[in-house]
Amino acid sequence: MLDRTNSEFEFRGVNHLALVCKDMAKTVRFYRDVLGMPLIKTIDLPEGSGQHFFFDIGNGDSLAFFWFANAPEGAPGIASPQALPGHGSMITAHGSMNHIAFDVPADKFDA
């Protein structure tokens, strides 16, 4: 097997993933209050165009969200899946994010 270690950049993992949310308050309530992820940073974007905020997901990694004041509505089937598994297509467009999965111990969730 080839050694594919990157000697130029010392990649240590993913610093953060950034998604776009429709409602900042609901997003914060879910990730902070339901999932227990600490909200660690909030940035107001220039000219009142929105906010960028970060949740601690452990191991020095973050899950980030943008909220844009004038963002267009989502486009199911293009930017997000049209349906849940078993209920229709899970296909999304190139460059879109289909889902995010968190690594948690099996005894901490009900499958």
Question: Model-found features: residue ranges?
Answer:
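A broadly used, surface-exposed interaction patch
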Residues: 72-83
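Vicinal oxygen chelate
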Residues: 2, 23-25, 82-111
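Aromatic-acidic/polar surface patches that form glycan- and anion
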Residues: 10, 20, 102
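Core-facing hydrophobic residues within beta-strands of well-ordered domains
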Residues: 11-14, 97
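Short aromatic/hydrophobic contact patches that present stacked aromatics
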Residues: 16-18, 54, 99-101
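A detector for short, charged/polar N-terminal pre-domain segments
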Residues: 1-9
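Core segments of cupin and vicinal oxygen chelate
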Residues: 20-72
